[in-house]
Amino acid sequence: MRNRPRTLVALLVTPVVLLLAGCSASNLPRLGLPEPVTDNGHRTLALWQGSWVAALIVGAFVWGLIVWAIIFHRRRGEHIPAQTKYNVPIEILYTIIPFLIVAVLFVFTARDEAIITKISPKSADVHVIHVNGIRWSWQFKYEDLPANTVVTGTPDHIPTLYLPLGERVRFDLTTTDVNHSFWVPAFLMKMDLIAGRTNQFEVTPDKLGTYAGKCAELCGRDHSRMLFNVKVVPPAEYNQLLNTLKGSAA
């Protein structure tokens, strides 16, 4: 009987230790998310971390109360303790606290969502790239190039989308058939391509590299092969690429 509290603590702590053992020191602060490579990605990561902190605080408090009740208020003998019901102050407290928690999470989420989905005015210096989903690949058209300059991929030939480092980019998302979803995990951002409408979002890449992208909406037979790459390059290299594409389309 005396070892029961220790056993209970061990049962609670062991799963947490095993879970943390699967994370490296560099990955642990991100709590399962990849390292962000855009300005909006850092904001998404901060929101994710804040939500986890709130969840852990609430969870620790609730589990603490449960363990406290199990250890110090377990039933002893045949004595039945006083039964408490219809306690209006406690019921009000149980209603207000969850409401406040949800309200705080909502405020921060709404604030960050408004920033992440904000579109720059037409007068702003923004690179516009039209992304069209097709079964089962992608078409990329850079607005700075002639209309007939379209990079089209296939399930066997994965297309590459080039972005300039440190410069604002807007994606105009459309589909010519079924619904798809444009997802680059390193962006910490996913947006659907819905038939009959154009969805938009903007990012500013802040890290050079090549990042995998994919369709995140089940769209048919070759959905799993609907892949693409995103390569973030220096602005000079990006402009050179556009000139090369323009020359090949001439």
Identify the residue ranges that each predicted region occupies.
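N-terminal secretory/membrane targeting signals
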Residues: M1-A25
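Membrane-entry segments of alpha-helical transmembrane domains in multi-pass membrane proteins
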Residues: R2-L8, H42-F61, I96
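Non-transmembrane, membrane-proximal soluble domains of secreted or membrane proteins
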Residues: S24-G50, I70-A250
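Alpha-helical transmembrane segments
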Residues: G59-H73
